[in-house]
């Protein structure tokens, strides 16, 4: 239990705070802990000793800025310097130097690291906490078998098991089990000590026969017996030092190292008082665990819930970085040890600087950030995405679960998740329930547990105090649910509230409550907290909405929502995309690149981001929000980022929608839109694509960048400058050359003319030709060149490879095939774009912008969109914005409906439009068909909804193929858009064509267009020359492949053709 200094009102913590705290903990504590573990290293003769002086290590500020590291594809890291000493023991002389041991990537203001110019983020992992856990399972006879599982800090598991005869076994594998006395004796306890330290010695003596006594007669015998069972070796192994080392390395180190958290858990579960610094499993632990298991057998004690959060721990960024630093120091130790021995062998005088290399630390962190499953490329589709990414919790990764082996129970919601892990926000698909998201108030405690804040209700003190409770503490208190608090604030004694106690939900009197929730959003993640009226939605649809908000594309003209939850400003602020003034002063100059501020007599330049590409090809930019001559204060927002307006998150647009069918164009989640959304650039977004090419040194010489490319048409080279690189500002189309490159190669002898061969023979000249290997713009890449980068890597080789990156901006309007979605899981594909005069229109003549299918609401039970739609219309007419916290029914029944209807009534009176609120069908209105001018038969629900345009766009998905590559084995077209693949006609598609009797089309698809090699060639020739296309006679290649596979199984398969003339069988080879 941790008490917070804040009293009364609570403030929402920074959304990136968990990442920052973890990295600071690594820098302040983790580095020191690992450096203290670095041993003193001696040579074989013990004449020289090398050691590190940890107290004064230094981290140097990076020489480059974050923006330059991204631009030049470098790592934003800090150099680590540690004082080291080399002591010559005979004379006790010491040479001390401050040595450079490597680089550690730093965390930036977004909570991410920049490695090789790429933003990467480290995900928090949930693991089973080390300690002991008791479970009960039924065997095949239906009898309960009690087991105790000891989990080490490494994740290794050992099991204790008690059978029907009350004999206790230690299970070292699935098949092998051994008496509990053997491992206890192998760990150093004799029989007398074992019997003195257990509560039930008679049970231990009951299964101690002569054979067992011989096994534990001495420590050596016990070790041999344990090794024989563990390693499953036959014969009679001989006790030796190497055998002990092998057992120590393979078993005890992996399964008996508890760690700091494991020791604490073991002491609390078994009521032990072993010191915290003793992190290894002791015989006393094993015997106490066996005693507890015997008590379980006879009905004493409680079983453990493995899925309770008190039995889990969070492996944060601090733990992961500390583990990698320790691994790097082990590698450094081996390097130093080898270098010292080499220096002594060659009679050289070593110095601390010569003994240490920076390679182990630098390469360890590079491989960690590049290859580790928990280090991921930061998703920067929009500001919400990059902020939510760092708050993910994963059961996957090293030491964790896999998507295919995790059970339903692990994936399910647990009562201990309340206020810690969001019950809504998780991934869809195979990883559902395995990748979650932190609740907005949750934080990671000192022992790796998730803590959530609550208000303490005390009769002694009238002051409200906020406490952070761990999962192991809050189940002992009555915690009132925050979504259904006091109905009558003045008389708390008369209230009956739902509460949570020991994983059960009860209804109790108010005076029995110990704690209450602090905020209705407390149990949700950021994505779920941005959904208005979430309490009226089905949880599955809320999950879809949380995920789809992260897929929203920043639009060219952002607009904040009319109906929100109040969390939009905090989300935009913590995302880091807005620029905030660090000093107060007067604005003296603004443009798209910078803002110049005059304050305290100094001039400060604030750089802005302009046309920066995210890894999802969206455009990140900043817009100045202050004018020249204005005075600003410290902390004021001076520039908005992409998808923010006025410091609030703005992912979509408020558009006029109607829920009605329209000629079938909005059936099955299709959406009908007005052309106003296209021509008015309502849903226009900018996307930046990156194309790169490298130059290499081949065996025939280096590749050249040039604008003189032979055998290419001039119009393809029109945009190249004199260096052979496309010019800034050029408009490029598909197939244009972006970078001209020639690769040298030797021509074949047969390709030379006879006179060329004669000259070469006389003069001895080696004539080489070059092959054109230019960077060409692929299909769908047309746009404007906005940036070109020529990067040369620094290296020690004689020739350093160069990388040329070309960035092309595309302007994309909304079109048929694009995906749009609301904030309630209501998603759809644009099916038709109607002229605005043909769209249905309101009674004041305003045409509708989008038409949704009304059948998509009842079955999906996401009624929140109806409340948002109607309240948005009222807000648009009244020029008002609403910020509504969820679960407003805790104030009164039907609070949401009353709010919406009252605002519609106000809008109707204020605008003198009675159709806005008609009592017969509130929220609905009579609208007219734009094509005929006639009113529709039924009133239609209309309103303003906040609709997002998602990253799933038709330009990235549509694909066609006329010719392309074929698979080598099956000779069928390749699969996928990236490989210019074809569309597969599968088994069910063939059935459909067979059902319509289209024999010729079916034959074309299975032969000419697929894997009949000869027929493909004949079709090409016939198309060029003219004439009828011959029918394929023999079998296609896939059938021939099947025949060959059957032959490899010794099954001969042939087909025979019977002649029509003489009925003779003509055998043909398949």
Swiss-Prot record:
Q: What is its EC number?
A: 2.7.7.6
Q: Which reaction does it catalyse?
A: RNA(n) + a ribonucleoside 5'-triphosphate = RNA(n+1) + diphosphate
The top EC class is: transferase
Name where it mostly resides.
plastid
Q: CDD domains of this UniProt entry?
A: RNA_pol_B_RPB2
Please state the gene responsible for encoding this protein: rpoB
Biological process (GO), any one: DNA-templated transcription
Protein known as: DNA-directed RNA polymerase subunit beta
Q: Which domain of life is it from?
A: Eukaryota
